[in-house]
Each structure stands twice: as structure tokens, then as C-alpha cells.
């Protein structure tokens, strides 16, 4: 039991540390992605003067209007959120994975499905702990100073102000808008993110590629891109719902949000910011590869071993 508890803490710390570093490095891409993704909601609310023309234009415009440091706006909330989220994801994923206990050689597809299920379940459990921080990070990142030409005032002064104003206008429920569809999205994303990586790792990272950080990074990048694109429309819906807390007009449900976006903006609007999301996947790949590297150092685990 003592050994299991020690391994759990190592999983918790290794996952959280690698996540915090990677997310901070990718914070500028993350903010650009969120701005492009939610720009139509911001324009409707009068929080954005004109739409962004692409990743480059959004980056340049944000720096020009708000300063270089603004690219990290919302990152503090993201690190606070992401450390326990990713740490719990990794730690619980291994707990859930051991519950299935299928043999990879004798029952490959059951083992594969077990990896998918354990990754999804870990993500859903973790989300319930830190959703309000994800909401706060989204609102801060989309709080642009371009509501009118020449710049405008911020809607929020910081993390605490997001909580204060949201609770004042919408109550606690305002912090959890979009939670249900987020649970669906997190199961899809984490299920692919962890399940595919753990399933492909012992198959791909063998021989000369075993313990190869670059190979692990590239595999993680590919998995992160695939998982991100598969769940991206769900991510757009949940964040658009988050953006309506504090506004007069809200979506009745996630399905209503989906209908309104498709009807008024077209299907392509569900994928706005997906290009930046692919660049952001570098951070996700770094988390996966870095986590494995830390486990090699701390526990003696190997990339290709497939060990829990």
C-alpha cells in the first residue's frame, strides 16, 4: 500500500510539473486560439470591434493593443487549474487502468478499450474539481481591450474579479455554464489522448525508438492533434456557453448553442481557432513525453514497457 501511495504521489507531481511548464510555454498560442474561437460571441456582446483575420493578425493585433505581456493573460488561472487537472488525470488514469487488468497480448482490443475508458474516466473525474478555474481562464483570455477603436476597458481585473462578478450576476451556476457538454468533450478528448498514447506507445516506441524523447514527443503531438480535432466542436460549444455568463442573452442548452452557431455562422465556425490548436498541441505532446521522462528518472519506467 505504501508503495502504491508513493507511486500515486510521483504520478501526481510528475504530471502536474510537466503540465505547468508546457502550458506556460504555449500560453501565447493558447490565448490566440481562444480569441479566434470565441470572437463571434465577443462581437455580439460588444467586447470586440472587428473579427480577427487569422492567427498572425490576431497575434499582432493583441500585442499592439494590449502589449506583449497580455499574451499570457489568463495563464495564472490556467496553471492553477492545469496543475491539479493534469496531475489528477495521470494519477487516476493509472488507477482506472489497473481496474480493467486486461492482458495486452491475449486480449488486445479489450486492453485497448480499457485504456480509452481509463483516460476518459480520469478526465471526467478531474474536471469536476477544477471547472470553475477553466471558466475563469476562458473569460480572462477573451477579455480583449479592443471593444472599440483605440482600445477599451477590461471587463475583469483578474482571477478573483471573474469569480466576484460572475457570482453577483449569475450565482454559482454561472461558473459552471457548459459543464455537461464539457464532460462529454473531456471523455472524448482524454479517452483518445491517453488511450491512444498508452496503446500505441508499447507498439511504436520499441527497439531503437525506446526511451527516445523525440519519438515520444512526435507520437504525443500526433495523438494530441487527433484528439483535439475530434473534440474541437464540443470545445467551441462549451466555451461559447461560458462566454454568456453575465450577459442578457444565454443559450438554453448545449444543443441550442450548437443550433444557433450552425444556423447563424455556419459549421466552419465550430472549428475557428483549430489551426492555433494544432500549434498548441506542441504543449500537449511535451506533457506526455515529459511525464514519461520524469517516470524514467523517478520510477525507472520505460517508454516502451507499457507499464502502469
UniProtKB/Swiss-Prot annotation:
Quote the subcellular location field of this record.
Answer: Mitochondrion inner membrane
Q: Which Pfam families did the record assign?
A: Mito_carr
The Solcar repeats lie at 6-99, 110-203, 211-297
Q: Which GO terms describe its biological process?
A: mitochondrial ADP transmembrane transport; mitochondrial ATP transmembrane transport
| Regulation (activators, inhibitors) | The matrix-open state (m-state) is inhibited by the membrane-permeable bongkrekic acid (BKA). The cytoplasmic-open state (c-state) is inhibited by the membrane-impermeable toxic inhibitor carboxyatractyloside (CATR).
Query: What is this entry's stated membrane topology?
Result: Multi-pass membrane protein
The chemistry this enzyme catalyses reads: ADP(in) + ATP(out) = ADP(out) + ATP(in)
Purpose = ADP:ATP antiporter that mediates import of ADP into the mitochondrial matrix for ATP synthesis, and export of ATP out to fuel the cell. Cycles between the cytoplasmic-open state (c-state) and the matrix-open state (m-state): operates by the alternating access mechanism with a single substrate-binding site intermittently exposed to either the cytosolic (c-state) or matrix (m-state) side of the inner mitochondrial membrane.
Q: Which PANTHER family match?
A: ADP,ATP CARRIER PROTEIN 1-RELATED-RELATED (PTHR45635), ADP_ATP TRANSLOCASE (PTHR45635:SF14)
> What's the name of the protein?
ADP,ATP carrier protein
Native species of this protein?
Answer: Chlamydomonas reinhardtii (Chlamydomonas smithii)
